[in-house]
Structure formats: C-alpha cells, structure tokens
C-alpha cells in the first residue's frame, strides 16, 4: 500500500511580481496568483487527501483554501513553519534591482541562490534543508500512523529540499529547480 503526498507552491504574490525578496514577509496573492491557486485546485480535484499542511504566511493559507474547496474529505489542516519560505533576513522587502545596485550582481547571486551562504541575518538553502528534512521525517511518521494522504501548500525554496529528498537529487540539481506557481508534485510513501 502507498500513501500520497501532493506538494505545491503558493500562487504568485505582489512581492514575486515586483521582484522583491519576500522570505518571511507576508505578501498577498496577485490576481494571477489567485488564478494559479485555482489551476492547482483544478489539477488536484480528482486526488484524495485527508490532511493538509500550510505555513503561517497568507500566501500558503490562501492557496490551500482554493485547493480545499474540492476536498471535503480533508478534515485536518496543520500549520507547520518548518516548510516556510527561506528567510532572506535584512534583504526582505528590498527589490532585486536595489540589492544588485548596492552590492553587485555577483553578491546578489550568492545571497539569492547559494546553498551554503545565508543572506545577512537570513538563512541559506542548507539551513532550510535541515528544517525541511526534520519536517519530512515527522510527516512520514504522521502519514503512516494515520494512514492518510496529504497536501502541502509550500514555498519555492522549501520545496527545493523536499524535492531533493523524494527525487534523490544532488545539491546542484536541487539548486537548479524552478518550482511553478500553478502545478503540483506527487510522491508516494510505502506503508
């Protein structure tokens, strides 16, 4: 027997649209982001899951709300910030252009996409991976104990280590991933 995980990224936010470092700042879904959430909901409408996970950020919660409209069987919604977006620390709220202008493209790229280097007072992807792996360990226990399929409304950078784990990717492969706003990934857990 297999249990299923359906993981998806929240829809586009205003900070995403404006190319700002969002991180742990709360940025609402744009009209396109709402359409993204509806597309995910439509693509998942024939799947079954009894529990769903979200983070405390409205973009995760709001995307999940659209998905859950098709899933009356989902009785448990759990907020778990181990799947929250990467903290960009002092960069949060700043536009990419501003950071490039102030620190240069090379430093921007290091802070934006480096595995090992955190942004000032923020997290590296390596740090995000550590908390996501703890979440995965507990998630698998939860699923097996309760015999449930789950949906996870996540974030672009928390999905990277999640996908690395289930797709058995290298760090390099993980860092090249782009997670779409309007689709989901499905993984199986053997019980």
Region locations from a protein language model:
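Phosphate-coordination/substrate-recognition cap region in phosphate-metabolizing enzymes
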Residues: 38-107, 166-169, 174-177
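Short coil-to-beta-strand
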Residues: 2-12, 104-109
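Short, well-ordered beta-to-alpha junction loops that form the rim of enzyme active sites
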Residues: 55-57, 82, 113, 152-157
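Active-site-adjacent alpha-helix immediately C-terminal to a catalytic or transition-state-stabilizing loop
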Residues: 2, 61, 133-191
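Loop-to-helix element that buttresses phosphate recognition and phosphoryl-transfer chemistry
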Residues: 6, 12-62, 119-133, 176
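Short, basic/glycine-rich phosphate-binding loops at helix/coil junctions
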Residues: 17-20, 105-119
């Amino acid at each position: 027997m297999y249990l299923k995980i359906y993981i998806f990224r929240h829809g586009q936010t205003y900070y995403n649209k404006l190319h700002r470092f969002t991180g742990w700042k709360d940025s609402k879904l744009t009209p396109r982001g709402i359409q993204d959430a509806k597309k995910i909901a439509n693509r998942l409408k024939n799947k079954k899951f009894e529990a769903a996970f979200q983070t405390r950020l409205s973009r995760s919660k709001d995307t999940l709300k659209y998905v859950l409209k098709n899933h009356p069987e989902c009785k448990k919604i759990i907020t778990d910030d181990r799947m929250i977006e990467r903290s960009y620390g002092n960069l949060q709220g700043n536009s990419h252009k501003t950071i490039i202008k102030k620190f240069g493209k090379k430093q921007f790229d290091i802070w934006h996409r480096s595995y090992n280097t955190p942004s000032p007072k923020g997290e590296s992807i390596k740090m995000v991976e550590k908390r996501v792996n703890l979440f995965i360990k507990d998630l698998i226990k939860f699923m097996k104990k309760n015999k449930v399929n789950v949906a996870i409304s996540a974030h672009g950078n928390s999905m990277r280590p999640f996908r690395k784990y289930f797709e058995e990717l290298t760090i390099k492969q993980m860092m090249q991933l782009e997670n779409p706003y309007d689709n989901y990934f499905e993984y199986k857990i053997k019980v």
